[in-house]
Amino acid sequence: VIPMFEKETGIQVVYEEYETNEIMYPKVQSGAIAYDVVCPSDYMIQRMIENDLLAKINFDNIPNIKYIGDTYLEQSRQFDPDNLYSVPYCWGTVGILYNKTMVDEPIDSWSVLWDEKYKDNILMQDSVRDAFAVALKYIGASLNSTDLNELEEAKQLLIDQKPLVQAYVIDQVRDKMIGNEAAIGVIYSGEAIYTQAENPNLEYVIPKEGSNLWIDSWVIPKNAQHKENAEKFINFLCRPDIAKMNFDYITYSTPNTGARKLIEDPAIRNSKIAFPEPEDLVN
C-alpha cells in the first residue's frame, strides 16, 4: 500500500522494519534518526509516553479514525489513557498452536509448556515480554505484575522450562509448525491463521488461565520532521479498503470496522482466531 500512498499524495516514504520493540525503542530515544511514524506495541507506547518521546496527534487530520472500533480505542486507554498519542493498527492474542497428530490430547492450559513428554518439541517466543506473560498467567498473576515475588517465580519457571524447549524463535515458529518440526508453539493469533491455512493439523487455543491481548498502534515521535505528512499516512492506513489490504497481507486482526465488513471470506470474517468472542478475552 505504500506505493499507493506515494502516488496519491506525492509524499515519499522511507520504510524500515524492526524485529522487536526493544530494538526500536533506543533508536527513537536517541533521536539519531528522526522517524515520522512508528508502530510499537501497547506496553512500549506506554513507556514512550512516560518518557515524553511522543507527539500528540491532531485528530482533525485523521477523519478516518471513525472507522476504528470503540472497543479498541477503549482498550488503548490502558496504555494511552486519553487516546492522545496512538491510533490502533492491528491487534491479537498470544496462544498455543499445537499439532493434533503430535500431542496426546486437546490442549487448554499453559501447563503443557512444562510437560516433559514434549521435551525438544516446544517452541517459545524469543521475547522477554511474551515469555514472562506466559509464566505469569500460568501462576495466576497479572501479565503486568510488578510484584517481585511473582516475577521471581515466573523467572524460575522459565529457567526450569529451558531444557524442554527446542528453540526460542520469533517468525520461525510459523515455518517450524507448518513443517511438523515441533508439536507445540507459543504464537501470535495472526501467525496462527496463516499456519492453519498451510497445515490443517494445527490448532490454536487461548489457554484457560488467560493470555495477552495486544494492540500495535501508530504513533508520531516528538522529534518527527514531517508531522502533518505522518498524520496523512495514518489517515490513509485507517481507510477501510487500505486496512483490509493490510489485513489480507499480515493476517493480524484489524480494529477497523469498515475493513472487517470488506473481508470476502466468511470463514475469515467470522474467525474465532482473528476475532474472538468477548467472553474468550475476559482473562
Roles of regions detected by a PLM:
Residues 1-47, 175:
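Early extracytoplasmic/lumenal segment of secretory-pathway proteins
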Residues 123-127, 131, 135, 143-207:
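Ligand-binding pocket segment of bilobal, Venus flytrap-like solute-binding proteins
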Residues 55-66, 86, 200-212, 221-224:
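Short beta-strand->loop
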